[in-house]
Amino acid sequence: METLKADLSDMSDSPEYFETLANRDLPRLPGTSKLHRAACIKRKSINLSLPSNSYSLSYRQSDDTDGDVSESQSEYRLSSGRRSRASFARALQDPQTPNTPPVSSQHRRFFSEGSFNLPNSNMSHSLNGDSTASNSSTLTPNRIYGDRNRQDYAQSSRYTLPSLPSSPSYNCPTTLRKIHTNTSSNGTSRRVSGLGSFMAQNSSETSSNRTSAYLPGSSTDEQEKRSSVTLASMPSSHSSTASLLSPLDTTSFSTKLDSTILALETDESLSRTISYATTSLPSTPGKRLSKESLAMSEASSINPEYKRIKKRANLIKELVTTEAAYLNDLIAIQQSYGLRVKECSALNPVDAQTVFGDIESLLTFTVEFHSRLYQAGEGSWRVNLDTQLIDPLPCNLGLIFLESLSEIGQIYTGYCNRQDSVFKIITKWREKPATASWIMEGDKIVQKYTNAWDLGSLIIKPLQRLLKYPLLLQKIIDVTPESSSERPDLVLSYQLLQELISGINQKQKPSHKRGSLSASHKRDAAWSLLYKATSNKSRPTTTSTELKTDARLNFQRQVLQDFRQRFAILKALHATLETWYVTVHRGFSVFEKVLAELEGLSALEPEDKPVDTWRKYHLLAHMMTANLPSQIQTSLNSSILNPITNILRVIQKVIQFIISAEFVIPAQKLEAISTLVEKEFHSVVYHFIGIQRSLYENYAQGFLFLIPQDMRDSILEETQDYAELVRAFEPMHYDDEVLLEELMKSVSLAARV
């Protein structure tokens, strides 16, 4: 230890020691070359030029005793009288808190450009020749930093300099002793640094927080000639424009070479002030992979099917979230412009109705449509590693589009057809000063809530949203398996939307450039049968008037529309029948449980009701529950559900054939296909009516068995018709039959064909 004191005493008197310490270069980042370790003026870090003759190096040794453990500690202090501004203390306006000179620099990669050098002319340092082991040394600066000359700037400052690491270039035998940090009351301590200041806190007696900044441990011969000390704090995930705040438990940044530590210790009052000022600031986490990210990456590498499911879930999220953003734009139009029409008397009521007349209906429809999309796609928000590669809830987005297609066509067709007139009116409003100020005021309001900048960019949103629907559906179809039950609905809704867009596009003028549908639908290969028939170069071209007057194409278009309507109805009927069977089975189960409870109650009071009667009732309910649902399920699958599935496949193939055909299909073939589908559909409906009648007749017979004989005879005498008895037990039976008959009439193609 005496040898170490002598070596360091000789080093403290040597100016070359500080020059060597000042010019140690920052560690080279991974993937960089030596050219990146340029001179200090090119390096993106702060230089604090410290003259070699204005510091003193003092050594002290103390024993820290904690219980039975005694540890000898040695430290070296570099004393200086430099002063600066304490931003945190000044911000808190605490007159009792002195200003302590922060010394800091920032790693080069956290600055955008240039180096930052503090001038030597604004500061001067005094030399403290006292080398005794004291806890603090008070120095009075020879010159005030800046233009402020107040007595409270006199502040003690102490720089703790541990011993240098062993290195061939420095020949220093000491090793690096790490400075550990203490946790604060809330378990965290923060590193505070401004653009050019790094404030560290340390107190050996008061156990205050200590923050250390690493000094780079590499150097070059050229840089050893410079006289500067660079203090580099190297947090892993901070910005240079904000204060550097890091939790105390963050691992210290280490390099291959040993680094020295230059710590700034302040007094207890400033430590408390800074700790109080920084407790409300959020801590910045380090760069580390979370467990969820690691688990997700492992699952994606193990099971490739997860990637497809995750992509599909993200697309469904995109559809729902963009619909919410579109709804927000519609609300912005209504709030910023539509409801303020009465404030401007210069607006023509007819023009205002043309521009904003459809916004209310669009807003009402979009609110309901977004709610249905969110409920249908809710399962995509829970697609994670725990799901068995399927959505937790069914996603019937295609069916929702099919059910809303009529409203979409009715609302958006009129809105799109009036776009030319709407933009002409908006242009006219901006040319007049009275209406221009009203529009500009609305533009300022709307910019606070949306990304749009004016009325024109908001008016075009419905057209853009209509074009977005088929694009999103196409992406969802691409990641939906062929065997999925949702794929036919998605494909059909995509085709119907494309046809709707093509029909709207035919009414648009070519000169209409904003939100034009022309370029979009032409990029689609199957946008319309008429466009495909005329786009074939091998066939002679015909005009649109000739196509409209062609009776064969009109009939083909009508048959295509009828097939699509029938497909949607049959799809809904298939789902309804499955739900009906589940309801019937549940009803019999509930009936059996009720009778079982009554049997148990009768056993408690056998004198009121014979136990055998309740046992007979329970047995009858059990027979009905066990036999009737099984018989219904067999008949339902063989006579109804399977035929409906076959009809849906045939209709889908016919629709795709008509859309993809580049020639006019003969009317006789279409009539034959329509007749076959209609007969099969009628057969399915009649089978379902027969199953319902058989079920409720057996249901009624069972209840007649439970009714006493005298009451049974009176009921039969009054009704005189067994069908009325069935109707009495199940009123909804005949209502369902009437609805099915009306459904058959609406789907029938006999009158049209």
UniProtKB/Swiss-Prot annotation:
Database matches in CDD domains: RhoGEF (cd00160)
GO biological process, one term: division septum assembly
Locations listed in the record: Cytoplasm
Bias-annotated ranges (Low complexity): 230-245
Domain of life the protein comes from: Eukaryota
Biased composition (Polar residues): 94-105, 114-141, 181-191, 200-220
UniProt cross-references to InterPro entries, sorted A to Z: DBL_dom_sf, DH_dom, Dynamin-Rho_GEF
Gene transcribed to yield this protein: gef1
Domain DH: 311-507
Subunit structure: Interacts with cdc42.
Keywords: Cell cycle, Cell division, Cytoplasm, Guanine-nucleotide releasing factor, Septation
Region described as Disordered: spans on this chain: 52-150, 175-194, 200-245
Name used for this protein in its record: Rho guanine nucleotide exchange factor gef1
Keyword Mitochondrion among UniProt keywords: no
GO function terms (MF aspect): guanyl-nucleotide exchange factor activity
Gene Ontology CC terms: cell cortex of cell tip; cell cortex of growing cell tip; cell division site; cell tip; cytoplasm; cytosol; division septum; endocytic patch
Organism: Schizosaccharomyces pombe (strain 972 / ATCC 24843)
Function: Has a role in the control of cell polarity and cytokinesis. Involved in bipolar growth, via modulation of cdc42-shk1-orb6 signaling, and septum formation. Stimulates guanine nucleotide exchange of cdc42.
